[in-house]
């Protein structure tokens, strides 16, 4: 067995025994990481240290980012101080205004499972303000960027335009919710209308990506219709 299913179930796909909110959008289950496995693998392969997640309702991707970095240390790739954020293995930043637009967060309190287990650095602001008043001011270069904040076309385009300027030489960008076929098959209950058309912005934006970027779409909707599938993950890197 390549992966520790018990650890995955307790810490990555669940907050101990409670399912991580929105994990299903990644096609994840109790013992399966879904598209999170792609993100984990890319961070491992490219030795990414500075990881930034724009938007995260349940902290699923931030914890995978941190786990990948820690595992790089524990397997002898990273060396030095193992501290999760202030040592030699990099840092995971989560940027989220926690304004309930597009969903709720469950990790804002300091004693939340995510924060006391994986210790991400929280930027409780909009992505636009965080870009200007934190990342620019601290001259941060990003090795892995995950875009999953505002889902309108304008929001996704702005986040990409701004944060892509901060990428390191070998930096990677992933954009979530890019598979419009998933949305076409998904039934939204009347009480959460804010989830309607959640792929419209991301799927429209990726069609406009210039030749300066290599684009890889990872869609598994419809391959196995008896199991959860991802809402779409698109990976971008400089051509």
Residue ranges and their predicted role:
Residues 2-46:
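Class I SAM-dependent methyltransferase Rossmann-like catalytic core
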Residues 1-3, 238-239:
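Non-catalytic N-terminal targeting/anchoring module and adjacent flexible stem/linker
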């Amino acid at each position: 067995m390549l992966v520790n299913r018990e650890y995955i179930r307790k810490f990555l796909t669940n907050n101990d025994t409670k399912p991580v909110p929105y994990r299903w959008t990644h096609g994840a289950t109790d013992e399966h990481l879904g598209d999170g496995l792609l993100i984990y693998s890319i961070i491992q392969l490219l030795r990414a240290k500075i990881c930034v997640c724009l938007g995260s309702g349940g902290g699923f991707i931030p914890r995978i980012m941190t786990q990948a970095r820690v595992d790089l240390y524990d397997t002898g790739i990273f060396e030095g101080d193992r501290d999760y954020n202030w040592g030699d293995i990099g840092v995971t930043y989560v940027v989220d205004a926690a304004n309930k637009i597009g969903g709720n967060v469950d990790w804002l309190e300091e004693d939340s499972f995510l924060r006391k287990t994986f210790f991400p650095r929280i930027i409780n602001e909009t992505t636009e303000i965080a870009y200007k008043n934190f990342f620019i001011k601290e001259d941060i270069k990003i090795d892995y960027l995950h875009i999953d904040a505002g889902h309108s076309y304008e929001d996704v385009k702005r986040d990409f335009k701004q944060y892509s300027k901060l990428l390191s030489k070998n930096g990677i960008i992933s954009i979530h919710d890019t598979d419009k076929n998933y949305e076409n098959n998904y039934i939204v209950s009347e009480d959460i209308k804010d989830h309607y058309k959640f792929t419209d912005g991301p799927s429209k934006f990726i069609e406009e990506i210039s030749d300066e970027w290599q684009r890889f779409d990872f869609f598994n909707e419809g391959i196995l219709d008896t199991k959860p599938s991802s809402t779409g993950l698109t990976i971008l890197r400089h051509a």
